[in-house]
């Protein structure tokens, strides 16, 4: 939930916030499907950028709604997620080509999580979440594990898919949800506001 000033209200996150965050899992397959359908397979840098931007916008929207962000912070979160995923996917595609192996997917996850996490951490810092920079590493790890889980259970996503499947989304949202729960704990926000 958001406070009247538009910041994340840490006392409201708790269990209900974590549950809302977990419901946002559905944004991953929806975003991936739209990104693939509208941007095409991420086989070229332009297609990767477009697909990543679309996918990231949908994921960012789902997550921002789960956080209960007010309009300005909501827009910033969506933009950070879209740009982070779009740029990361384009960079990885430029370096290694189309993602078609488990190793490529985990690398994409780490780079995407790092880029998305950096942008989202900036929003968390703006919203006075304590130790928001932890979010960058947690996101990189969660996104890499998400891709590992999806490819590890034998899900054969079509080459050029911009984001992992529902199984990977569940794992990454649990990891990041627990980190958010800690970052948005009342003592964490209060201590960062005093700093």
Feature-to-residue mapping (PLM):
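Juxtamembrane/disordered regions of integral membrane proteins
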Residues: 2-195
């Amino acid at each position: 939930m958001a406070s009247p000033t538009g910041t994340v209200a840490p006392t409201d996150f708790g269990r209900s916030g974590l549950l809302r965050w977990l419901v946002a899992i559905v944004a991953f397959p929806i975003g991936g499907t739209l990104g693939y359908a509208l941007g095409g397979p991420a086989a070229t840098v332009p297609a990767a950028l477009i697909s990543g931007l679309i996918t990231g916008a949908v994921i960012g929207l789902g997550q921002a709604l789960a956080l209960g962000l007010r309009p300005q912070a909501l827009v910033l979160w969506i933009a950070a997620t879209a740009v982070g995923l779009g740029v990361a996917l384009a960079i990885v595609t430029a370096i290694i080509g189309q993602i078609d192996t488990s190793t490529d997917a985990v690398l994409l996850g780490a780079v995407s999580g790092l880029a998305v996490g950096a942008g989202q951490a900036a929003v968390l810092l703006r919203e006075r979440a304590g130790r928001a920079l932890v979010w960058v590493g947690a996101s990189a790890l969660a996104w890499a594990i998400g891709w590992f889980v999806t490819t590890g259970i034998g899900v054969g996503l079509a080459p050029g898919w911009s984001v992992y499947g529902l199984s990977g989304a569940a794992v990454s949202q649990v990891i990041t949800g627990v980190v958010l729960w800690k970052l948005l704990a009342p003592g964490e926000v209060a201590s960062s506001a005093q700093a």
